């Protein structure tokens, strides 16, 4: 079975928080779809809390759209990684990593400004599959850590696994 692209990079060398352009694909009509690795935690060293990750999932995509979407960029989806060390963001267009990092930073500031749990979008039994599994406090802790550490840019060449 062929390796997925995410398993072709050396996770022991990944910095965090950091942005990595994981892939660019062309649609049949010629549009670019970019996939970004938004790494919140150093793999195998740290992990985002379950409730904090879930709450970020509800907040992050909307805030990133506010700061990154434009005439040439439209976010399709932002989803948490199963390992809980980050999120994958798929979008139409090819923004540079610095623009993505700036939008991510602004989105984390937005998370810190959410006044209370009732302000989390889609936090109800009709729109969320596990609506009891949220923590705004934990999401804010994750956001504050990102802001405190600063967001860097990953270099794919430095991360490439030898035989992948």
From Swiss-Prot:
InterPro entries: LuxS_sf (IPR037005), Metalloenz_LuxS/M16 (IPR011249), S-ribosylhomocysteinase (IPR003815). It catalyses: S-(5-deoxy-D-ribos-5-yl)-L-homocysteine = (S)-4,5-dihydroxypentane-2,3-dione + L-homocysteine. One of its GO terms (molecular function) is S-ribosylhomocysteine lyase activity. One of its GO terms (biological process) is quorum sensing. Transmembrane segments: none annotated. Binds 1 Fe cation per subunit. Its EC number is 4.4.1.21. It is an enzyme of class 4 (lyase). It holds the Pfam family LuxS. Keywords: Autoinducer synthesis, Iron, Lyase, Metal-binding, Quorum sensing. Fe cation binds at residues 54, 58, 128. Its cofactor is Fe cation. Involved in the synthesis of autoinducer 2 (AI-2) which is secreted by bacteria and is used to communicate both the cell density and the metabolic potential of the environment. The regulation of gene expression in response to changes in cell density is called quorum sensing. Catalyzes the transformation of S-ribosylhomocysteine (RHC) to homocysteine (HC) and 4,5-dihydroxy-2,3-pentadione (DPD). Belongs to the LuxS family. Homodimer. This is S-ribosylhomocysteine lyase.
